[in-house]
Amino acid sequence: MKSPLGMGATSGVTWAGFGKDASRLRAQRGECRFVPVRGTQSFKMAERPEPLRLGSTAPNFKAETTNGPIDFHEFIGDNWVVLFSHPEDYTPVCTTELGAFAKLEPEFAKRGAKLIGLSANTIDSHSGWIKDINEVSGSNLTFPIIGDKQRQVALLYDMIDHQDATNVDSKGIAFTIRSVFIIDPKKKIRLILSYPASTGRNSAEVLRVLDSLQTGDKYRVTTPINWVPGDDVIVAPPVSNEEAKKLFPEFRIVKPYLRFTPLPKEKATVS
């Protein structure tokens, strides 16, 4: 199958269920192609895929990772998954980010969530770089990192930066941006974040959002600004006051549309 970048045969990634039938890929995600920008070596996306939105089914793919080959939907299984991309291996901001995620991996695991990284580098590059990450951060990085040299998964998930002229490789082709996707066990996308290449992410914030999503799914509540587990939550608007009295005996009305409540003690911790 011809690479979406027009650079020949693919390597490391295949479109699960598509084989060599590119038309089926176009039907699923919209046709995307690259054209050279006159006077530069960079490439500009002429037609971008249909954007993924909150609630979209996470597109499936097969890829090589530092932990071996995966089918993404099989990798998700019955778990939550945090899929995140970084621009390039052996770079300063990315090194600090992956070290931080590696240190928090046990906390994600407690919540039934898997981590998986991605960049437009080879598996060999990832494997060598992991040694640096562990040395610099004092971490033990064990989660898989996808080798997406041809940017196929990056295109599928719209992780390509086509505005920042500094975020390109030696051929002028755009690197991946700092994208984050939280995907639930039903394979639905629940969070999408995009950071510029110059700005490192906050791994604790990704964990906080996961806590919020899991709490909201389990109980009929939403979470206010800066919420962390143990703080009061907000009774969801569809819940009537009569229902709220049964569900949350300690709820209080601040405004008719704003009702706070602590979760019962046994409900305060997200499993």
Kindly give the residue locations of the regions a language model identified.
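Chalcogenol-based redox active-site neighborhoods
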Residues: 17, 32-271
